[in-house]
Amino acid sequence: MTSLDLFADPVDLTAALVDIESPSHHEEAIADAIERALRDLEHAEVQRFGNTVVARTNFGLDSRVVLAGHIDTVPLADNTPHRLTSSLTGETILHGCGSVDMKSGMACYLGAFARLAQPGKAAHDLTVIAYEGEEVATKYNGLYLLERDHSELLEGDIALLGEPSGAMIEAGCQGTIRVFVDAHGTRAHSARAWLGHNAAHDLAGVLSRIAAYEPRSVLIDDCEYREGLNVVGLEGFVATNTLPDHARLIVNFRFAPDRSVEEAKAHLEEVLALEDGLELIYDDVAAGALPGLGNPVAAGLVKAVGGNFRAKFGWTDVARFSSLGVPAVNFGPGDPGYAHKPEEQCPVDEIRQVSAQLLEYLSAESE
């Protein structure tokens, strides 16, 4: 049975979390350890749903900040337990599966919650959510399940998600739409092409329109979001001497959070301008999240991180909070470029930096 010390140095707590292997669908041990540690806090109300653990303070303060992070990882790649190394510049690096995505962020959040879950310590009531199943299908995502079944637990004036962001705020996120554009023809031998109809050729027009598309950039709360429309897949091969009777483009549209899903769909369909006979199939749709940095509760966080913020281009679970009307940002240590890699790693200085900035932001002494 693993014990966690939530009051430990955040680097040591990160290492302890990394050493509890928790690939998706196998989060029970880490959830057990987190639950036990949180239940030791006198003033925390703790609930568990599957392998998702939620703890809250209820001091009757005027505002609430939600701290959320996932506790599952991608499959192991011979990269546990953790290890520490020094870079050529003398920087200490913590290696291990989940070190950057996102057990370091989770360690910072759990540590801040534990230290401030006492009367008079925090400027806001706090909720911490350690959830399962982020790295797999949505139906397993613990935050999605909370949103569906217990949305009141996600309520707050602002939510922070511990995704790796280089120890700066990555505000909001862009929405995403993935569609299939299907063409249907008649198969024939390429030596007798007049006997068939080449489905791939029917996609030439829409392919050229996508290639010519000029994506927009938009500034929201001083964050610049850059949209993108791209073909990310092509299908239709039968044989090297055969006209394909079916061809498909897989298209991804990343849209700024000032567009609703309906507006993004309408814009996408206008740009694609499909010819008769082509079929449009929506495969995946997810709304974006506005940055919310104009929210008064966010001002203290912006100050605590020295005004360092930028737009989040990818989609993250902050959108789940945004859909409930809760402004949300990504804030965690480390370079997301190391996520999911065998050499996953996180600088220890960034872990301590995020931990200190969180405490500065959330502490009653900072008011």
Segments and roles (model prediction):
Residues 34, 106-116, 146, 203-206, ...:
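Buried hydrophobic packing segments
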Residues 28, 79, 106, 139-144, ...:
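Conserved strand-to-helix beginnings and helix N-cap segments that scaffold or border functional pockets
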Residues 72-90, 156, 171-182, 329:
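Acidic-glycine-rich active-site phosphate/pyrophosphate-binding loop
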Residues 93-108, 189:
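Glycine/serine-rich anion-binding loops at beta->alpha junctions
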Residues 107-175, 366:
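Acidic/histidine-rich catalytic neighborhood of metal-dependent amide-processing enzymes
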